[in-house]
Amino acid sequence: MIQQESQLKVADNTGAKKVKCFKVLGGSRRRYATVGDVIVCSVRDVEPDSSVKKGDVVKAVIVRTRNDIRRKDGSTLRFDTNSCVIIDDKGNPKGTRIFGPVAREIRDRGFIKISSLAPEVI
């Protein structure tokens, strides 16, 4: 579960390393976000010569969470990190590569491009 003030790692090659969530999109008083949800973030830590700068406000979709993801068949899935991928206003990823596995729920939510760029879909 990701909420306001949560810090996430960035799982793409935009140059951002860490972002801080300050809004969960999808409702006026929505508190928590999980895999496949879109959040608004501020970039906190960047690599040199990156396409995004520190302090930029970006949209991101969550691809991994440490909290359990429950599936319809009763199985659960948990990752080691809270990670996201920075997207543009149309929902396409800004980077050209995705690092690490992503959950299958990403494809179910309509982020086909992210799931196709990922090395592994769990």
Swiss-Prot record:
GO MF, one example: structural constituent of ribosome
Name of a matching Pfam family: Ribosomal_L14
The keyword rRNA-binding is assigned to this record: yes
SMART domains per record: Ribosomal_L14
PROSITE patterns noted in UniProt: RIBOSOMAL_L14
Oligomeric form and interacting partners: Part of the 50S ribosomal subunit. Forms a cluster with proteins L3 and L19. In the 70S ribosome, L14 and L19 interact and together make contacts with the 16S rRNA in bridges B5 and B8.
Protein name per its UniProtKB record: Large ribosomal subunit protein uL14
Species, as recorded: Chlamydia muridarum (strain MoPn / Nigg)
